[in-house]
Amino acid sequence: MKICPTCGARLSGKATSCSRCGAMQPQTSGGPRESAMVGEKKFLQFPKETSGLEMSARAYNLTIGGLLLYGFAVCAILCFFFTAQISMLNPIAVFIGFLVCGLIGIVVANISNSAGVRFIGFNLLVVPSGIFLAGCLSTYYFETVVYALVGTALIAAIMILCACIRPQWFDALGPVLSISLVSVIVVEFSLRIFFGRSSTFIDLAVVIIMAAFIGFDFLQANQARRTLCNAVTFALELYLDGVNIFVRLLKILSRSQN
């Protein structure tokens, strides 16, 4: 039972209009569906940068795609045109430099509020990783490299498509994927210490985990605010996913050929 605020008539609780004066009656409850939608909206927000102008969805995704193309183009240039010069460098120094610059780049790309500074961090990862890959690719057959590239592209396309069609698959995967990746790294490190080698199963596990990370990172990118800073950061994360898959596929394919 409720009272019409216009004429004071008594109405049933489900009435949407007053039978005496015809005034529309306010609905007092939004119900569980409204509460669930509010909770879902709050849960789906993963902001990495909370200031700056927001871009359209199309411009935002094109920016991420353009940054990824730029990163892989830099890698390709270093691998195809500077392999001879890079192969003359000390491999241990190259690896250490890659790790140091990569870590600095990741930190810079995540803590700065300037898109330009984040782009510098992006390059601090892209260029050393290109140099590192150029030194590695000289030990593989050209066909193996091509197969690994095609495989990486197909995996990335499939996972992004899955993230678009079934985003709920990737919503809560972040902690699970992180724990899985750390566990695999620990196992691989132990194998190298005690047996002096890794395993194809480890490489397959990393490929599967990083493939899931592509879907997860793409979903996060489109749930965060569509700013230029976030576009750079998520492009870096997707770039890392792709490079890891490519390197592991190279190892798997080279073992199968041998």
Protein language model regions, located:
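A hydrophobic alpha-helical transmembrane-helix feature that marks the membrane cores
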Residues: K2-S12, T16-N258
